Amino acid sequence: MTSLDLFADPVDLTAALVDIESPSHHEEAIADAIERALRDLEHAEVQRFGNTVVARTNFGLDSRVVLAGHIDTVPLADNTPHRLTSSLTGETILHGCGSVDMKSGMACYLGAFARLAQPGKAAHDLTVIAYEGEEVATKYNGLYLLERDHSELLEGDIALLGEPSGAMIEAGCQGTIRVFVDAHGTRAHSARAWLGHNAAHDLAGVLSRIAAYEPRSVLIDDCEYREGLNVVGLEGFVATNTLPDHARLIVNFRFAPDRSVEEAKAHLEEVLALEDGLELIYDDVAAGALPGLGNPVAAGLVKAVGGNFRAKFGWTDVARFSSLGVPAVNFGPGDPGYAHKPEEQCPVDEIRQVSAQLLEYLSAESE
């Protein structure tokens, strides 16, 4: 049975979390350890749903900040337990599966919650959510399940998600739409092409329109979001001497959070301008999240991180909070470029930096 010390140095707590292997669908041990540690806090109300653990303070303060992070990882790649190394510049690096995505962020959040879950310590009531199943299908995502079944637990004036962001705020996120554009023809031998109809050729027009598309950039709360429309897949091969009777483009549209899903769909369909006979199939749709940095509760966080913020281009679970009307940002240590890699790693200085900035932001002494 693993014990966690939530009051430990955040680097040591990160290492302890990394050493509890928790690939998706196998989060029970880490959830057990987190639950036990949180239940030791006198003033925390703790609930568990599957392998998702939620703890809250209820001091009757005027505002609430939600701290959320996932506790599952991608499959192991011979990269546990953790290890520490020094870079050529003398920087200490913590290696291990989940070190950057996102057990370091989770360690910072759990540590801040534990230290401030006492009367008079925090400027806001706090909720911490350690959830399962982020790295797999949505139906397993613990935050999605909370949103569906217990949305009141996600309520707050602002939510922070511990995704790796280089120890700066990555505000909001862009929405995403993935569609299939299907063409249907008649198969024939390429030596007798007049006997068939080449489905791939029917996609030439829409392919050229996508290639010519000029994506927009938009500034929201001083964050610049850059949209993108791209073909990310092509299908239709039968044989090297055969006209394909079916061809498909897989298209991804990343849209700024000032567009609703309906507006993004309408814009996408206008740009694609499909010819008769082509079929449009929506495969995946997810709304974006506005940055919310104009929210008064966010001002203290912006100050605590020295005004360092930028737009989040990818989609993250902050959108789940945004859909409930809760402004949300990504804030965690480390370079997301190391996520999911065998050499996953996180600088220890960034872990301590995020931990200190969180405490500065959330502490009653900072008011």
Model-identified regions with their sequence ranges:
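Metal-dependent amide/peptide-bond hydrolase catalytic core
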Residues: 2-5, 164, 171-172, 178-367
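A structural signal for isolated positions on well-ordered beta-strands in alpha/beta enzyme cores
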Residues: 66, 127-129, 279
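Conserved strand-to-helix beginnings and helix N-cap segments that scaffold or border functional pockets
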Residues: 28, 79, 106, 139-144, ...
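Acidic/histidine-rich catalytic neighborhood of metal-dependent amide-processing enzymes
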Residues: 107-175, 366
